[in-house]
């Protein structure tokens, strides 16, 4: 029985080996990806569907997030990127620090998203002269360098160093500066909602005492509007901060600043309203034009590129420069 089955398999392979080889090669071509992504023009995401709150004021127009379509770097996609003018081949290393893996990149992006959403609330409520409450401002591990000797991970919230409470990077630094190279320090942290102890060995680099981590404060705020953000599990990053702040502001003030227009844009935002640059503005602008947006808002450091793309491609869209949140509101008022 076994011999007959073996003979059948062998004969089938002999008769169909060319097809089998072709099939395997075909599957590999479209499934095996390299350390590249292909950036292509993206689209719009209406923030009415992303930010939910109580007692919203009505709006005739819309504020929209813009995004870049990133395709996996399979061989056919890589080859097409050399043929299609609006497609660009980008190394994944461009968004990677040292040797971090995809999960670490995503965790950093989630930290950015949480932080910028809170910044958007604060910037909007400050401009509208409305109250909000800072519930948390966690000292969070944003990155762990390869040179470190610690069991801390990205996303850990540090509450104490050697049993001394810390609230920000300066307080953390002051404690580390009392140590010497080779000392081991103990961290009290929160990871996955559980309090635990971790350690790190101090080392010296360029005259500074280091643990080998990058820290950031992540704020969470609450308001009487019960604001909720709706994002999928693989969405992350801070580039939607400005547009989120505009959406929130428009929902909490009587005057409709959209004026019935489809307004798209991009840019990070700080809690004090400063707008920061982003990557991929030409793909975001192309997506906005493709989806018939009336206005595109670009951060100052991306503004010239956006204007250049508009002129080069003869785009029919109004482009606004974004320096600060307050200035963007004034520019929208002047439309």
Regions found by a protein language model. Give the residues of each.
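N-terminal Lys/Arg-rich, disordered targeting/topogenic segments
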Residues: 1-14
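Hydrophobic membrane-insertion alpha-helices, especially the h-region
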Residues: 16-35
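Second-shell loop/turn segments in exported
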Residues: 102-115, 143-144, 160-162, 228-238, ...
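PDZ/PDZ-like domain segments forming the peptide/carboxylate-binding groove
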Residues: 115, 121-169, 274-279, 291, ...
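Terminal peptide-recognition signature
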Residues: 125, 155-158, 162, 187, ...
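PDZ-domain C-terminal substructure recognizer with occasional recognition of PDZ-binding tails
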Residues: 174-215, 312-327, 331-334
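C-terminal, low-ordered peptide segments at domain boundaries
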Residues: 192-247
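Glycine- and Gly-Pro-enriched alpha-helical subdomains that act as flexible
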Residues: 251, 271-304
């Amino acid at each position: 029985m076994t011999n007959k089955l073996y003979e059948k398999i062998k004969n089938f392979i002999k008769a169909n080996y060319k097809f089998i080889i072709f099939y395997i090669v075909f599957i590999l071509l479209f499934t095996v990806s390299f350390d590249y992504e292909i950036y292509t023009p993206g689209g719009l995401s209406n923030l009415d569907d992303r930010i939910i709150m109580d007692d919203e004021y009505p709006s005739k127009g819309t504020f929209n997030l813009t995004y870049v379509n990133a395709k996996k770097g399979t061989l056919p996609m890589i080859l097409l990127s050399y043929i299609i003018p609006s497609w660009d081949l980008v190394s994944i290393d461009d968004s990677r620090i040292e040797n971090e893996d995809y999960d670490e990149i995503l965790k950093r992006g989630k930290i950015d998203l949480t932080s910028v959403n809170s910044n958007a609330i604060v910037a909007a409520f400050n401009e509208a002269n409305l109250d909000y409450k800072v519930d948390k401002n966690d000292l969070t591990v944003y990155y762990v360098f390869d040179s470190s000797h610690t069991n801390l991970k990205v996303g850990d919230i540090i509450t104490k160093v050697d049993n001394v409470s810390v609230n920000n990077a300066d307080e953390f630094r002051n404690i580390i500066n009392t140590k010497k190279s080779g000392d081991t320090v103990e961290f009290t942290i929160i990871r996955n909602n559980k309090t635990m102890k971790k350690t790190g060995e101090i080392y010296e680099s360029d005259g500074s005492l280091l643990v080998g981590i990058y820290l950031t404060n992540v704020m969470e705020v609450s308001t009487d509007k019960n604001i909720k953000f709706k994002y999928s599990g693989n969405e992350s990053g801070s580039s939607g901060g400005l547009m989120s702040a505009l959406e929130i502001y428009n929902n909490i003030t009587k005057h409709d600043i959209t004026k019935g227009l489809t307004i798209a844009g991009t840019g990070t935002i700080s809690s004090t309203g400063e707008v920061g640059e982003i990557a991929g503005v030409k793909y975001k602008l192309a997506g906005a034009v493709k989806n018939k947006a009336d206005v595109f808002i670009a951060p100052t450091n991306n503004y010239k590129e956006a204007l250049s793309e508009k002129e080069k491609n003869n785009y029919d869209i109004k482009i606004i420069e974004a320096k600060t949140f307050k200035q963007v509101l004034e520019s929208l008022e002047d439309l």
